[in-house]
Amino acid sequence: MKKKLDLENGNLSELFISFTMPATVSLIMTFLYTVADGIFITRGVGSSGIAAVNIGYPIINFTVALSLMFGIGGATLITFKKGNIRYQNRYFSHIIFLNIVVYIVVAAAIFLFTNPLMMAMGANEELLPMVKGYMYPCTVSTSFLMIATSLNAVVRSDNAPKRAMHSTLIGAGMNIILDYLFIFKFNLGIEGGAYATAISQIAAAIYLCRHFAGSTFKLDLSWKRLSFKIMKRIISIGFPSFILEFAVAIITVLLNIAFMKEAGIFAASAYGITGYSFMLFRMLFTGLSQGVQPIVSYNYGRKNFARVKKILIYTHKVTFVLSVISLILIIFFGKYMVNIFTSDFELVKESAKGFILYSTALSFLGFNFVNIAYLQAVDRPKISNIICMSRSFVFVFIGLLILPKYWGINGIWLSLPFADFMTAVLTIPFLKKIIK
């Protein structure tokens, strides 16, 4: 019989590995089937292909950010009410309802206003057909991606972190295989990459839905059962996760515009390659922060505050070690990572330089992500929101306004490290006050 994880009294190191490892592997596999598009599209379509994907993807990223908000916000509430089936089912139903409403609105906006949306995010007349070719199939499958993203958080909160990981493994494996077939064997171009992503997302969502067959979770979407108060609570707790994820889209748009203005499609392509490479390390720290949340929120709900503090300190120690290792790997092996995407010498050179500059953000990014996740898990959404908003919008924007004036294109690369450094400085006083 499978041993049940004891969140309250179990060995901390074992619990940490049991929850953070599947969450981290899941997100790294998400990176792999996202980066598979980048590799196959760059090799099969050209550098303009990856620039097109990088312009269109922020909209998909926006919907994923919303579903992550619903999933983590709802899953945290479910963990607080562990054992209370009535409340668990209500929270679960609200998670699904919110995803359905958002998908309908976003899909309608994409299909009705494609051209102005893509042009606003940095596309030009040359890239627009490619962007549309990628976006249309992906938009159709985004409903499944949203459900899978939210359900991943719920499944983890239901003491099944490995099942959440398996769903991502299925999606990643299918995406890589189908990318190769559709782009190189069937010559479907950028649309082939979109079809591969769409099919893999559908498969992952279907697998996750199996977890709830015969479980205590029951879906009830009747209007009488829906509560705006519950929706507000879910959004309040999950909002920092939305900001962190949506920040990827916002930062991508801002930097795309800055790079296009500074050096055209070449610079935007270099940023696209760097963005894919950096995503691996970002996923590592996102996985750690998301994985530890169920442990923190469960013990916080049981008022076991000493254990909550111990978990935070332990997680920061692990994060520090991984940050140092990650930076060393990027400095010495970063050029080999970007070379996977393209063989163009000048593009590899600029991407490798940009990768190192951009990745200095890792010195503070892991620290920030863990703190934000901790604040969510201990029901401090206001402070978490302030930190997220400052990092994702205020500090990045300030960096883009100031740094390029002194260092040109290098200043654009350094805008994210600047934002994460300033966020860490802002966070420390809040953190000291809370953990006393």
PLM ranges: what are they?
Residues M1-A23, I78-S141, K185-F239, V296-A361, ...:
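Short alpha-helical transmembrane segments in multi-pass integral membrane proteins
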Residues L7-V45, P58-G73, L77, I100-A107, ...:
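N-terminal transmembrane alpha-helices
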Residues I17, L32-Y33, F70, A109-F113, ...:
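Residue-level signal for transmembrane alpha-helical positions in Major Facilitator Superfamily
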Residues S18-D37, P137, A148, G171, ...:
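Transmembrane helical elements of multi-pass membrane transporters/channels
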Residues L32-A51, M118-E125, L181-L188, A249-L280, ...:
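Helix-terminus/linker motif at the lipid-water interface of multi-pass membrane proteins
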Residues S47-P58, V131, M135, A194, ...:
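Small-residue hotspots at the loop-to-helix junctions and early N-terminal turns
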Residues I50-A108, L145-A164, A270-I328, F332, ...:
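Small-residue-rich hydrophobic transmembrane alpha-helices
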Residues P137-R156, A164-N175, G193-L208, T286-S289, ...:
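Short runs within selected transmembrane alpha-helices of multi-pass transporters and secretion channels
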